[in-house]
Regions:
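Catalytic Tyr-X3-Lys loop
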Residues: 25, 33, 40-60, 78, ...
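Substrate-binding pocket helix/loop in short-chain dehydrogenase/reductase
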Residues: 38-39, 46-51, 135-136, 143-147
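Amphipathic alpha-helical dimer-interface segment in Rossmann-like NAD(P)H-dependent oxidoreductases
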Residues: 53-73, 85, 112-113, 117, ...
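C-terminal substrate-recognition "lid" of short-chain dehydrogenase/reductases
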Residues: 59, 155-184, 189
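Conserved NAD(P)H cofactor-binding loop of Rossmann-fold oxidoreductase domains
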Residues: 30-36, 186-187
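Catalytic loop of short-chain dehydrogenase/reductase
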Residues: 70, 76-103, 108-117, 129
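A glycine/serine/threonine-rich, flexible loop-to-helix segment
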Residues: 91-93, 117, 124-151, 161
């Protein structure tokens, strides 16, 4: 365990998985955090942290995992992005996160192009508003209601909605899908 933004942590993690399980068939890169800063307030440190935690961690994980995935009969990589890479809102400023997730999606496409010859699929899912462990409460009920209202389907995604898409992309049914960013956002990015 450790912070994937730190040098060497991704390699240690992939190596530990390979040692424990004798290989690696699938990788889901879900590292990230939401730095609440507008573009006007954006600091170099916040931007660097976001890039280290998201596209940097993905690059380190996928790069280290590649030889193991090449030995698999059904190698898959799925990265978790976010709708913020596609829809910026002034009332919910996440400039560093938006930029980092957009860079992550670009790396997904780059890796897909480079890894395809070895049969490795590389895709991303981009969730919209998704309920977390701390669902609506008296302190945040208005924010959840606003998020539901902003989502064309009128509901917030559950973690299982996102997990189902990831599971599909890891399955044999998705063996012809690579280099894609698939939104699971209730129409938020329409």
């Amino acid at each position: 365990t450790g912070d994937l933004a730190e040098p060497g942590v991704a390699a240690t993690l992939v190596d530990a998985v390979a040692t424990r399980f004798g290989g690696l068939d699938q990788l889901v890169a879900n590292a990230g955090f939401a730095a609440r800063q507008s573009f006007s307030e954006l600091s170099a440190d916040a931007l660097a942290s976001a890039f280290a935690a998201m596209p940097g961690a993905f690059s380190a994980l996928a790069g280290r995992a590649r030889p193991l995935l090449e030995a698999s009969i059904a190698p898959r990589i799925v990265a978790v992005s976010s709708f913020v890479a596609h829809r910026y809102r002034a009332d919910a400023p996440f400039a560093a996160t938006a930029a980092a997730k957009a860079a992550l999606e670009s790396l997904v496409r780059t890796a897909a192009a480079e890894f395809a010859a070895r049969g490795i699929t590389v895709n991303a899912v981009a969730p919209g508003f998704t309920r977390k462990d701390h669902g609506p409460s008296a302190g945040n009920a208005a924010a959840w209601a606003q998020a539901e209202q902003a989502t064309p389907l009128g509901r917030i995604a559950e973690p299982d909605d996102v997990a189902a898409l990831i599971a599909f992309l890891l399955s044999d049914a998705a063996r012809q899908i690579t280099g894609q960013v698939i939104h699971v956002d209730g129409g938020l990015t329409l």
